[in-house]
Design a protein with these regions (language model features):
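Glycine-aromatic micro-motifs
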Residues: 1-137
Length: 137
């Protein structure tokens, strides 16, 4: 699980999906393990932040606009101690970075090694093996 920290230094590679308000409401509900089908209530915003009905992702955050459309993410703004991600999670991240941005295996590995919690549990060599489908746990 990864969280977006709007106060962190550096750049963040991200992928966006065009959703209706109802679809966004359903994603938030699913992450909170609540029934879908009810639109979010976006009242009481503080600096573009709303409380989300989840114990993990407790904040719906307005990120700005792109091409005139609002961008949102759900995240946790709590101080969370980073832990090493699983091989399956990292493989998904590595594949997504290549697919979305066309990054080489080396670029993807270098990017993930800068992410909190990845190193020292994961080395460039092991991430490279994951990238190339050669990793064996």
């Amino acid at each position: 699980m990864a969280f977006y920290n709007p106060h962190a230094a550096g750049e963040l590679a991200a992928r966006a999906y065009l959703l209706t308000f109802g679809q966004l409401s359903d994603v938030v509900a699913q992450e909170a393990r609540r029934p879908v089908g009810n639109d979010l209530v976006l009242e009481g915003a503080v600096d573009g932040r709303w409380a989300a009905p989840s114990h993990v992702y407790e904040t719906l955050l307005h990120l700005g606009e792109r091409e005139g459309l609002p961008m949102f993410t759900i995240t946790s703004l709590q101080n969370v101690e980073p832990t090493p991600p699983s091989a399956a999670y990292l493989r998904t991240m590595l594949d997504g970075l290549g697919e979305a941005f066309g990054w080489t295996a080396d670029e993807r590995v270098r990017y993930l090694l800068r992410a909190p919690g990845v190193a020292p549990a994961w080395t460039a060599s092991r991430l490279g093996q994951l990238c190339n489908g050669q990793y064996r746990s």
